[in-house]
A protein has these predicted regions:
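Beta-lactamase-like hydrolase cores
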Residues: 1-40
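Short, flexible loop/turn motifs enriched in small residues
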Residues: 15-20, 49, 239-241
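Short active-site loop at a secondary-structure junction
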Residues: 19, 34-52, 67-70
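Short glycine-rich loop/turn motifs
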Residues: 19-23, 130, 158, 242-245
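Bacterial peptidoglycan biogenesis and beta-lactam-recognition machinery
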Residues: 29, 58-66, 95-98, 140-145, ...
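Active-site SXXK
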Residues: 45-62, 81
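Active-site-adjacent helix/loop patches that line small-molecule binding or acyl-intermediate pockets
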Residues: 67-169, 195
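Structured C-terminal helix/loop/strand segments within mature extracytoplasmic catalytic/sensor domains
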Residues: 197-303
């Protein structure tokens, strides 16, 4: 799992720590431009796969406005706007928060987190779960078992994942939110999202464009995926737990990253360096390490 060093943490020009992992960059034609580590390694893509899950829902009949479709693809911050959006998806299907089977959580904002009671709407995957439930209602599928791997919805999602990645799911586990989680390669993740962004299928076009048009719904103010999509025209990006990230440009150039220790602190630097290899400026500020409250080093990509 370790892979190769992707980022270094420096202090007074000395490398104090490193983050290793796996990285693959695809050319517009789908060939590999650059790699570090082993992109054929099977990983759990976590929430970086939500656009493919959402595609399966739209294909099965989910019909909601683009802003809410972006929320179905989201790992959101639990702001009032995000929670209201998830509730709107449920309400359109005649459901309420009680139907959600994601875990309880608080908003990510520190002030809100101190005062808010845990709810399912505040959980960062509530948009996805609301979309899943709405898709079940449209198709007359059971809503109480929508997270079971053998449920028609989850079988449809798995089929979409395998079709888009070109791989067979090696193992089905359970994600942090309770939804089925699929094991396949980092390269398969890159190919799946590349296929999404270059697809002529109206389903895929709708999902990708919703995220590009409403990046604030996909993550939240100041967060990596939101700010990079805001700063790079046409970019699609989705990160996931345990330090996974995938990003794709409209012409099909795509990157996928897995940091082996699961720590996200170097993700901005690594993603910025990867985009630079495509000739794209992510407009990201350097991340400093501090000594006595002052910058004494930086977190930088090692490639």
């Amino acid at each position: 799992m370790l892979g190769e060093v992707l980022a270094e943490v420096t202090r007074s020009e000395v490398v104090e720590s490193v983050h290793a992992g796996h990285l693959v960059l695809l050319n517009a034609d789908g060939s590999i431009l650059f790699q570090k580590g082993d992109p054929t390694l099977n990983i759990y893509s976590r929430s970086s796969l939500k656009s493919i899950q959402a595609s399966a829902m739209v294909r099965a009949g989910l019909d909601i406005e683009p802003r809410l479709l972006a929320l179905v693809c989201a790992s959101h911050a639990g702001t009032p706007v995000h929670q209201q959006g998830a509730l709107a998806i449920l309400a359109k299907a005649g459901l309420g928060e009680h139907s959600l089977k994601c875990v309880l959580d608080r908003p990510l904002d520190e002030e809100l987190r101190r005062t808010a009671e845990p709810t399912r709407l505040a959980m960062n995957c509530s948009g996805k779960h609301a979309g899943m439930l709405a898709t079940c209602v449209i198709n007359g599928w059971p809503t109480d078992t929508y997270l079971e791997p053998t449920h028609p919805l989850q079988l449809a999602i798995k089929a979409e994942v395998e079709s888009m990645s070109g791989e067979t799911v090696a193992l089905t586990s359970v994600d942090g939110c309770g939804a089925p989680l699929f094991l396949f390669s980092l390269l398969g993740l890159a190919r799946a999202v590349r296929n999404l962004t270059i697809s002529a299928d109206p389903v895929h076009q709708a999902v990708a464009q919703a995220c590009r048009d409403f990046p604030e719904m996909v993550s939240g103010p100041g967060r990596l995926a939101t700010r990079m999509m805001q700063n790079v025209p046409g970019l699609f990006m989705k990160d996931g737990a345990e330090a996974v990230n995938v990003a794709s440009l409209p012409d099909g150039r795509t990157l996928a990253i897995k940091i082996s220790d699961g720590n996200q602190r170097a993700m901005s630097a690594i993603t910025t360096a990867a985009l630079k290899r495509f000739g794209v400026d992510a407009h990201e500020a350097a991340i400093n390490t501090l000594g006595g409250g002052l910058p004494v080093g930086t977190i930088r990509a090692s490639f």
